[in-house]
UniProtKB/Swiss-Prot annotation:
Reactions the enzyme catalyzes: L-histidine + H(+) = histamine + CO2
Transmembrane spans: none
Keywords: Catecholamine biosynthesis, Decarboxylase, Lyase, Pyridoxal phosphate
A GO molecular function held by the record: pyridoxal phosphate binding
Gene giving rise to this polypeptide: Hdc
GO biological process, one term: L-histidine catabolic process
Enzyme class, broadest EC rank: lyase
Protein name in UniProt: Histidine decarboxylase
PROSITE patterns named in the record: DDC_GAD_HDC_YDC
Binding locations of substrate: 88, 201
Organism, as annotated: Mus musculus
Region ranges (Disordered): 489-518
InterPro entries assigned: Aromatic_deC (IPR010977), PyrdxlP-dep_de-COase (IPR002129), PyrdxlP-dep_Trfase (IPR015424), PyrdxlP-dep_Trfase_major (IPR015421), PyrdxlP-dep_Trfase_small (IPR015422), Pyridoxal-P_BS (IPR021115)
Residues carrying N6-(pyridoxal phosphate)lysine: 312
């Protein structure tokens, strides 16, 4: 125990250290655009920086503070950077930070009203504020005479979707037991089926795994939206099979291309068929602060639950997820447990949020949300959304001005998807060139058989200069890729190609071709000082090699198949005419030491036996893939994190260890 005088010294010491940390955070956030966005580290980098065991005696604060830059920052992806475009935003702000600082100091566990009345009541009022700000139906309000619903803060949209599915399952099983009183719940549960689009977030699939409810992923239209016709057809098919439809998860703002499902078509079907309609607006929900963007909410009056993340675009840092339910009693009957030690004198009259969630304990999340709404006001939050949307429009205009690129899906809100015209390997190569420098962070996805790049405007501090700088880096990478592609694969249309002069790797080229419709036609590069794709220190340099799979396909073979088996894998399997043994990222991503040289007289382009040996290593299913297999988005390929000799594991790729092919 500390003596009173020792405690006073301790308190004063950490008061000074707290000010020091606030200054550090201020400096970090104000200069974050100057940092390299992605780290240049490999898995396990941190272990060598730390002792094997915890210290027996206290470390000095100066030593701890110094390790922030020495140990932590070298491995950080800077999500607050204006050059972070990979994922949907995860923003913060000073009011949010200060709110959580206070909440962490109070550190109450607000599972019941009695455990902390302010925690419960502030949350109820703020959730009503937020529902009105977004234009949600009145039945989602706590304080409304005709409402049976209300809102609550959850940790993630993933958890909210699971909660909604569990509540829908419980409600449907109770209705089924009324007709089949002798049936047990497990047999009834086995007949349930839920629906979502094939563009929905992976959390919907995970919710089905946890709840043991079958999930059907339904096809979308040309705009990647789930329509009523597809849902009605699936319901009729499943009823004929003796299944019981129970739940639909509609997405407003899908992960891949920010598409919007048609609530106005799905809602009436759910109402007539008795299905729970859950709406996932994780990213796009913040946009509904702006009345002009609420057209996507048409049909929201049919929703049984709605969720979105203020922790994405609303400048309230993680974790903070808004979740509203139309009928709170259906939620409470799913999660209510009431041991005597959790009861209190006002149990019947007060709201106890422990009955609205999976865990018991809950953080005082509403303080930071309260601070943000009051500090910015609705008008400034709306201006923030409009600014992000305008920056995305500006980037879209830059992409459309360059004939070498295409935009295969309509821009919505702050997300633009684009690709380099031509085979997928070109777009993949552009991403790899960008990743080597680490000056901006982009990730791919696939729509149908096309590899695309997602560009999300994230930071509230993004300027046109930031967008222009990043576009310059993208063009620079594209020029480099196109010049290498044209010089390594001569064709009748490539006769006008101007080869890059020696030593121009990492420098922008004025043009790589002259005229024509070829993707490598003459292109104007917008130059900006101080931004180039110079390779970061310690980065690897894969030598250009002929692709041994090229002759294994006919010219009619889909580009997707070539891309999946050839470009994506072989670039990681070969370096300087040497093959590497590799394993998928589902295993430990540690470079394998065994390398085998190719025979000097072995031709990568000739010899059927060599070709047969290559394909013998792949599952038969891989060779039988159809075009439709690629329509579902492959989300979040984290390109900068690829170890040099590891191949990515995804559903459409061979998920098995790959042996050296010699």
């Amino acid at each position: 125990m500390m003596e009173p005088c020792e405690y006073r010294e301790y308190r004063e010491y950490y008061r000074a250290r707290g000010k020091e940390m606030v200054d550090y955070i201020s400096q970090y956030l104000s200069t974050v655009r100057e940092r390299q966005v992605t780290p240049n580290v490999q898995p396990g980098y941190l272990r060598a920086q730390l002792p094997a065991s915890a210290p027996e005696e206290p470390d000095s604060w100066d030593s701890i503070f110094g390790d922030i830059e020495r140990v932590i920052m070298p491995g950080v992806v800077h999500w607050q950077s204006p050059h972070m475009h990979a994922y949907y935003p995860a923003l913060t702000s000073w009011p949010s930070l200060l709110g959580d600082m206070l909440a962490d100091a109070i550190n109450c566990l607000g599972f019941t009203w009695a455990s902390s009345p302010a925690c419960t009541e502030l949350e109820m009022n703020i959730m009503d504020w937020l529902a009105k700000m977004l234009g949600l139906p009145e039945y989602f309000l706590h304080h409304h005479p005709s409402s049976r619903g209300g809102g609550v803060l959850q940790s993630t949209v993933s958890e909210s979707t699971l909660i909604a599915l569990l509540a829908a399952r419980k409600n449907k099983i109770l209705a089924m037991k009324a007709c089949e009183p002798d049936a047990n719940e497990s047999s009834l549960n086995a007949r349930l089926v839920a629906y979502t689009s094939d563009q929905a977030h992976s959390s919907v699939e995970k919710a089905g795994l946890i709840s043991l409810v079958k999930i059907r992923f339904l096809p979308v239209d040309d705009n990647f939206s789930l329509r009523g016709e597809a849902l009605q057809k699936a319901i009729e098919e499943d009823k004929q099979q003796g299944l019981v439809p129970v739940f639909v998860c509609a997405t407003l703002g899908t992960t891949g291309v920010c598409a919007f499902d048609r609530l106005s078509e799905l809602g009436p079907i759910c109402a007539s068929e008795g299905l729970w309609l859950h709406v996932d607006a994780a990213y796009a929900g913040t946009a509904f602060l702006c009345p002009e963007l609420r057209g996507f909410l048409e049909g929201i009056e049919y929703a049984d639950s709605f969720t979105f993340n203020p922790s994405k675009w609303m400048m309230v840092h993680f974790d903070c997820t808004g979740f509203w339910v139309k009928d709170k009693y259906k939620l409470q009957q799913t999660f209510s447990v009431n041991p005597i030690y959790l009861r209190h004198a006002n149990s019947g009259a007060a709201t106890d949020f422990m009955h609205w969630q999976i865990p018991l304990s809950r953080r005082f999340r509403s303080i930071k949300l309260w601070f943000v709404i009051r500090s910015f006001g609705v008008k400034n939050l709306q201006a923030h959304v409009r600014h992000g949307t305008e920056m995305a429009k500006y980037f879209e205009s830059l992409v459309r001005s360059d004939p070498s690129f295409e935009i295969p899906a309509k821009r919505h809100l702050g997300l633009v998807v684009f690709r380099l015209k031509g085979p997928n390997c070109l777009t993949e190569s552009v991403l790899k060139e960008i990743a080597k420098a680490g000056q901006l962070f982009l990730i791919p996805a696939t729509i149908q058989d096309k590899l695309i790049i997602r560009f999300t405007v994230t930071s509230q501090f993004t300027t046109k200069e930031d967008i222009l700088r990043d576009w310059h880096l993208i063009q620079e990478a594209a020029n480099l890729v196109l010049s290498q592609h044209c010089t390594s694969q001569p064709s009748p249309r490539a006769k006008n190609v101007i080869p890059p002069p020696p030593g121009t790797r990492g420098l922008s080229l004025e043009s790589v071709s002259e005229g024509g419709d070829d993707p490598a036609q003459a292109r104007k590069i917008i130059k900006q000082p101080g931004a180039s794709l110079a390779r970061r220190e310690g980065g690897s340099d894969l030598e250009t090699m002929p692709d041994p799979f090229d002759d294994c396909f006919s010219e009619e073979a889909p580009n997707t198949t070539k891309h999946k088996l050839s470009s994506f894998l072989f670039s990681y399997l070969s370096v300087q005419n040497r093959r590497k043994t590799t394993r998928s990222l589902s295993c430990n991503s540690v470079p394998m030491s065994a390398q085998k040289s190719l025979p000097a007289d072995a031709s990568l382009k000739n010899g059927g036996s060599f070709r047969a040996r290559i394909f013998s290593g792949f599952p038969e299913q891989m060779m039988m893939m159809k075009k439709g297999a690629f329509k579902k988005l492959i989300k979040f390929y984290s390109v900068p994190s690829f170890p040099e000799c590891s191949s990515q594991c995804a559903r459409q790729l061979p998920c098995c260890p790959l042996e050296a092919m010699v």
